Swiss-Prot record:
Gene behind the chain: leuA
Catalytic activity annotation: 3-methyl-2-oxobutanoate + acetyl-CoA + H2O = (2S)-2-isopropylmalate + CoA + H(+)
Stored PANTHER family: 2-ISOPROPYLMALATE SYNTHASE (PTHR46911:SF1), PTHR46911
Pathway note: Amino-acid biosynthesis; L-leucine biosynthesis; L-leucine from 3-methyl-2-oxobutanoate: step 1/4
Domain Pyruvate carboxyltransferase: 33-307
Signal peptide (UniProt feature, chain positions): none
Homology family: Belongs to the alpha-IPM synthase/homocitrate synthase family. LeuA type 2 subfamily.
Name of the protein in its database record: 2-isopropylmalate synthase
Region spans: Regulatory domain: 439-559
Classification of source organism: Bacteria, Pseudomonadati, Pseudomonadota, Gammaproteobacteria, Pseudomonadales
GO cellular component, one term: cytoplasm
Organism: Pseudomonas fluorescens (strain Pf0-1)
């Protein structure tokens, strides 16, 4: 079987929402929502190998540390394991005073009774009721009409009131989800939710949560936003209701649907760290939160050690985070492209402390989430001079002049093409050494002596000539400065086109780096590098580096 030529014979387009006066497109997100993690329930039930109690507790502690204040811990009536985990959290004091445990149940009385029993002794708790309301579930799964579906919700809501009254020492919050909300007729979703509201009788001081799931994402995010805004406008007793979002990622737009849903009037977001969950996953709380952060909004969640959080999630879920996952993937702060690297390097050079972040290609400062800058620029065959220069400067304090960056990038390009792999900063530094600092054929500087005479410099250098049977030569010259004197003493006509120097390090361990662009015998200019504790020695080494590289080129040998 293959894809249909006419998919409309099998699939229907999702109907649009009639909301011509929608206001959400002109709204912005200006504050963090209430966050609820469903990692331990919705996320856990989707794992090939669900977490054991040890992993669950480790995950719980991570969520608390990050700052999630509402955590859906389990479906306690589903198994003894889930029930026992809730008891462990309560009895062993793992629930901070500012954090609320949440549990899920269906509408049967035995399940509800067991759920409330699991929460005995909790200071406060959210009990979450759900039943599916969409036409396909009514017809295919439950064989119920609308009245039957509404009766399930209403009867269960009454049981919530009954069993909560038996444990008056707990501060209860009730939550209801018309599961498959996004595929349910809006009028009917409102009808069911209004009926639940009447049973629970919330007030502005003691609100209930109405959670509106895109259980299966079935339309573009703007449609979900229209549904949320319509519900926000029309639900009864809106001032006593917290509207919660629970999106999935079947169409790849769970984050967008959540953000538009918040613009449409929602107050709360349920999801999982890094988007774990059934099928393609729940909305990724980390991405939504850090999207807010990069817009200047405090998300009230702390991902200062995002790699530490990732480690816990990967080990507990036994699922690796994708290297391109927003904010946390191994490659999301990494540039291989030459033009990208050049822009990033220039951005870092101009970025001042305590100013607005404006480094190109990096929407967030990696340091804010505990990342170093080491992996920002990596070099492969697509890389250019900017990335190579950045790595040498950041890792080794070597600041190549601009024209030398171009020349050395060609050397690196040849090496990456040969290897077929990316090069590390260490490999690039080694290549710089072999290409420039070890360029000692045919002339290797052995020693030099410098004297100042009447404002002029006199230089004598001893050179090992490897092209003439390893004999040592002595060249002498005078000039206005050491380099000019050395050039005057060379038996080969050379012209210094450019010279740069800088210190590497500071204090007693500092060294000098010198860079010379040299034209030999009127040929194409090449660069040389010298590094030494003495700046004069470094400049002489740089000149011999350039001289030898020029004389070693094929065109020089042919001449």
């Amino acid at each position: 079987m293959s894809m249909l030529k006419d998919p409309s014979s099998k699939y229907r387009a999702f109907p649009v929402i009639n909301l011509p006066d929608r206001t959400w497109p002109s709204k912005t997100i200006d504050a963090a929502p209430i966050w609820c993690s469903s990692d331990l329930r919705d996320g856990n039930q989707s794992l090939i190998e669900p977490m054991d109690a040890v992993k669950k507790l480790r995950f719980w502690k991570t969520l608390v540390q990050v700052g999630v204040k509402e955590i859906e811990a389990s479906f306690p009536a589903a198994s003894q394991t889930d029930f026992d985990f809730v008891r462990t959290l309560i009895e062993d004091g793992h629930i901070p005073d500012d954090t609320t445990i949440q549990v899920l149940t269906q509408g049967r009385e035995d399940l509800i009774e067991r759920t409330f029993e699991s929460l005995r002794g909790a200071k406060k708790a959210i009990v979450h009721l759900y039943n599916a309301t969409s036409p396909s579930f009514r017809r295919i799964v439950f064989n119920q009409d609308k009245d039957g579906i509404k009766a399930i919700a209403v009867n269960a809501a009454k049981l919530f009131v009954k069993y909560a009254a038996m444990q008056p020492d707990t501060e209860w919050t009730f939550e209801y989800s018309p599961e498959t909300f996004s595929a349910t007729e809006l009028e009917f979703a409102k009808e069911v939710c209004d009926a639940v509201i009447e049973v629970w009788n919330p007030t502005p001081e003691h609100k209930i949560i109405l959670n509106l799931p895109a259980t299966v994402e079935c339309a573009t995010p703007n449609v979900y936003a229209d549904q949320i805004e319509w519900f926000h406008r029309n639900i009864n007793r809106r001032d006593s209701v917290i509207i919660s979002l629970h999106t999935h990622n079947d169409r790849g737009t769970g984050v967008a649907a959540t953000e538009l849903g918040l613009m449409a009037g929602a107050d709360r977001v349920e999801g999982c760290l890094f988007g774990n969950g059934e099928r393609t996953g729940n909305v990724d709380l980390v991405t939504v939160a850090l999207n807010m952060y990069t817009q200047g909004i405090n998300p009230d969640l702390d991902f200062s050690d995002i790699d530490g959080v990732r480690k816990v999630v990967e080990e507990c879920n036994q699922i690796q985070v994708h290297p391109r996952h927003p904010y946390v993937g191994d490659l999301v702060h990494t540039a291989f492209s030459g033009s990208h690297q050049d822009a990033i390097r220039k951005g870092f050079a101009q970025q001042k402390p305590d100013t607005l972040w404006e480094v190109p290609y990096l929407p967030i400062d990696p340091a804010d989430i505990g990342r170093s800058y080491e992996a920002v620029i990596r070099v492969n065959s697509q890389s250019g001079k900017g990335g190579i220069a950045y790595l040498l400067e950041q890792e080794y304090g070597i600041s190549l002049p601009r024209r030398m960056q171009i020349e050395f990038s060609q050397v690196v390009q040849r090496e990456t093409d040969r290897l077929g792999l990316e090069m590390t900063a260490q490999q690039i530094h080694a290549l710089l050494h072999s290409e420039y600092l070890q360029a000692n054929t045919p002339y290797a500087l052995v020693s030099h002596r410098l004297q100042e005479e009447n404002g002029n410099s006199a230089v004598e250098v001893e050179v090992a000539s490897k092209g003439q049977g390893e004999t040592n030569l002595h060249w002498r010259g005078k000039g206005n400065g050491a380099l000019e004197a050395l050039v005057a003493g060379l038996p080969i006509p050379v012209e210094i086109m450019d010279y740069n120097e800088h210190a590497i390090g500071a204090g007693t361990n500092a060294k000098a780096a010198a860079y010379i662009e040299l034209r030999v015998n009127g040929e194409r200019a090449v660069h040389g590098v010298g590094i030494d504790e003495n700046i004069t020695t470094a400049s002489f080494k740089a000149l011999f580096s350039a001289l030898n590289r020029s004389l070693s080129q094929p065109e020089a040998k042919a001449a």
